[in-house]
Curated annotation (Swiss-Prot):
Residues engaged in binding Zn(2+): H101, C128, C131
PROSITE patterns, per database record: CYT_DCMP_DEAMINASES_1 (PS00903), CYT_DCMP_DEAMINASES_2 (PS51747)
PANTHER family the UniProt entry points to: CYTIDINE DEAMINASE
Gene that this polypeptide is encoded by: cdd
NCBIfam families: PRK09027.1
Descriptive protein name: Cytidine deaminase
Any one GO cellular component localisation term in the record: cytosol
Recorded family membership: Belongs to the cytidine and deoxycytidylate deaminase family.
Complex formation: Homodimer.
Name of the top EC class for this enzyme: hydrolase
Keyword Ribonucleoprotein among UniProt keywords: no
């Protein structure tokens, strides 16, 4: 079991903890498939809802909040039945808008893993307005069931009435819907090819600034992030922040980063290079490779 879970595992009921410990192997980064969730439910003799709430301390252990020191964990349950943990991330000494909220982390985890719809969000603190707006961008976002400790579950529409969303800006294919933009780039570099794939899967209906970031660590592992825009603009999630959240979930240190690539569309109304460099240079003393690509 990874050291970061030693304290949080003690907060779980013993039967649940005993069943979970073998799953917290060295490569665990917050994903449990539907069968594993069923195993935990059976072994603990708890309901699925009780298990998900009980797992929140494990999700919170993925957090990296050097500014607030407030650890928030969230779990996104996909339509597949799999669950995806996420946690808040803050960049030391940097402006607060670079922060990643736990719900954003969990949702981006699910999206990067191929999920196409979130049905439940479980979180240990009431979602802030920023996260409510972020969730509202998702497929059937208003129907997502929000679960909080010691409270009744409610759909997102309960927390965000009279919501402003994609449909108000004539966007009919929301975040996580199956869609891909094709780009042309001739490269044999595996890291650039990976970034190209993720840029094509990014979500930028308001600016057409499709983009992705790939981070490589010294051992050759890669961690990606995609751009995820929002109808309210400010809650948009930048690809560098998503990539850093991905890296931290995998229990890697910022000092492990050896290479960083931003790939973005030449036809976008904005560029993410400035914000991406700011975030990168806060955590790693390396240069950003910036590649601009043409849509097919």
């Amino acid at each position: 079991m990874q050291d970061r879970f030693i304290r949080s595992i003690t907060q779980l009921p013993t039967p649940l903890a005993d069943a979970l410990i073998p799953m917290l192997h060295q490569n665990f980064a917050g994903h449990l498939d539907a069968q594993q969730l069923a195993t935990l439910t059976s072994a603990s003799k708890m309901t699925e809802a009780e298990v998900l709430l009980a797992l929140l301390p494990i999700a919170a252990a993925l957090a990296k909040p050097p500014i607030s020191e407030f650890y928030v964990g969230a779990i996104a349950k996909g339509k597949s039945g799999d669950i995806y943990m996420g946690a808040n991330l803050e960049l030391p000494g940097e402006a607060l808008f670079h922060s990643v909220h736990a719900e954003q982390s969990a949702i981006s985890h699910a999206w990067l893993s191929g999920e196409s719809q979130i049905v439940d969000i479980i979180v240990n603190a009431s979602p802030c307005g920023h996260c409510r707006q972020f969730m509202n961008e998702l497929v059937e976002g208003s129907k997502i069931s929000i679960h909080l400790p010691a409270q009744e579950s409610h759909p997102l529409a309960y927390y965000l009435p009279y919501a402003f969303g994609p449909k108000d800006l004539n966007v009919t294919s929301p975040l996580m819907a199956k869609q891909q933009t094709e780009f042309a780039l001739d490269s044999a570099d595996p890291m650039i090819i990976e970034g190209l794939d993720h840029a094509g899967l990014s979500y930028a209906p308001y600016t057409q600034s499709f983009a992705a970031v790939v981070l490589e660590t010294r051992d050759g592992a890669t961690y990606c992030g995609r751009y995820a825009e929002n109808a309210a603009f400010n809650p948009s999630m930048l690809p560098m922040q998503m990539a850093l959240s991905n890296l931290v979930r995998h229990n890697r240190e910022f000092s492990d980063i050896s290479r960083a690539v931003l790939i973005e569309s030449s036809q976008g109304k904005i560029s993410l290079v400035g914000a991406t460099m700011d975030a990168l240079h806060t955590v790693a003393a390396i240069e950003l490779e910036h590649i601009v690509i043409d849509p097919v």
